[in-house]
Amino acid sequence: MESYIQNLFAERIGGKKFGKEDVIYKFEKIKRAKQEAMKRHPDMELIDMGVGEPDEMADPEVIRVLCEEAKKWENRGYADNGIQELKDAVPPYMEKVYGVKDIDPVNEVIHSIGSKPALAYITSAFINPGDVCLMTVPGYPVTATHTKWYGGEVYNLPLLEENDFLPDLESIPEDIKKRAKILYLNYPNNPTGAQATKKFYKEVVDFAFENEVIVVQDAAYGALVYDGKPLSFLSVKDAKEVGVEIHSFSKAFNMTGWRLAFLVGNELIIKAFATVKDNFDSGQFIPIQKAGIYCLQHPEITERVRQKYERRLRKMVKILNEVGFKARMPGGTFYLYVKSPTKANGIEFKTAEDFSQYLIKEKLISTVPWDDAGHYLRLAACFVAKDENGNPTTEEKYEDMVLEEFKRRLEGMDLEFE
């Protein structure tokens, strides 16, 4: 007999059909394919370039600060909307790394338990039924999901190679612009690796004023750039009048599981965010915030991380070009974004997802496919390399061993592209 609870689920998560849908989503397919492939080839190591998670632990000094602060009686309690010391550390960091000045640490900065809830809370603060959120695709879906949950609509802006993977704001219909409230951006961009330009950000500011929308720029990979200095949306004149930027510690400081981020920018948006946040969480553990302060005071940690990814990405580009792909260095992030072949070894593939499944099952190479705006594969440079004892390591000779095997498996596939 079916439980009455099955009839009580909210429509936003599927209503009465919750848990009964037989649709298997992309990442679940990847997970299942990896498990199947490893069973079929028990003596073959999986090369996982799909996971977008740093392969290293946080810097030893950051861990030391966490441990020391966790022992202090005064750090045991609720943090609510964050400790002021963390907020005070943000303006010097933004000026040193991004050249952004005049940030008010009291009213223009707030912390978040990672960037995912930050995106959810902002949506909660602004979206009513019928409102529109402008979303770039492919991309991180959290803002879109929550927009729909609140009865809003999502208007997708495809990121195309011919436009340097920047959205075409002029293509948005007038009726959509009239109902739009949020423009979500993510640069450096996941998955394309594209970096925005000052010219583009100026266009965004003008667009926001003209159409009265707020800008949410997700800078999760902000400092991981390979062509020039990191660029903040807030470095553009009047950007602070229309939006906020979200900075995560996950990618820049190898702290994915620590769950720490901060928002910086428009005072009204920060105030609304704080109101929503007050009703959802009680703040991140204070010792983690203290460790975050150390990070912001030591941006050279990110520079070491960035150098490792640049080294790996350049090697991956070389290998991919040698075996038949057309790869180039990204502007930022730790991803390569390459066109997916339509044929390999005489086998035809209609989508990037089809080819990605083939790579996992036949070559034990995991990637993430994207078919939202063309057919592409995302390959991450945060793959795990192991030493002779099977322990994770970042020594270059061991990452070279992974990449040599990566190349060996890809060679001779007779790739064809449209």
From Swiss-Prot:
Keyword Transmembrane helix included in the entry's annotation: no
Keywords: Aminotransferase, Cytoplasm, Pyridoxal phosphate, Transferase
Gene Ontology biological-process entries: lysine biosynthetic process via diaminopimelate, diaminopimelate-aminotransferase pathway
Family: Belongs to the class-I pyridoxal-phosphate-dependent aminotransferase family.
Major enzyme class: transferase
Protein EC: 2.6.1.83
Residues modified to N6-(pyridoxal phosphate)lysine: 251
A GO molecular-function descriptor: pyridoxal phosphate binding
Location(s), subcellular: Cytoplasm
Binding site for pyridoxal 5'-phosphate: 78, 115-116, 140, 190, 221, 248-250, 259
CDD domains in UniProt: AAT_like
Lineage: Archaea, Methanobacteriati, Methanobacteriota, Methanomada group, Methanococci
Assembly information from the UniProt record: Homodimer.
Protein name in UniProt: LL-diaminopimelate aminotransferase
Binding site for substrate: 25, 52, 116, 140, 190
Catalytic activity: (2S,6S)-2,6-diaminopimelate + 2-oxoglutarate = (S)-2,3,4,5-tetrahydrodipicolinate + L-glutamate + H2O + H(+)
Source organism per UniProt: Methanocaldococcus jannaschii (strain ATCC 43067 / DSM 2661 / JAL-1 / JCM 10045 / NBRC 100440) (Methanococcus jannaschii)
Main subcellular location: cytoplasm
Summary of temperature dependence: Optimum temperature is 70 degrees Celsius. No activity is detected at temperatures below 45 degrees Celsius. At 85 degrees Celsius, the activity is 85% of the maximum activity.
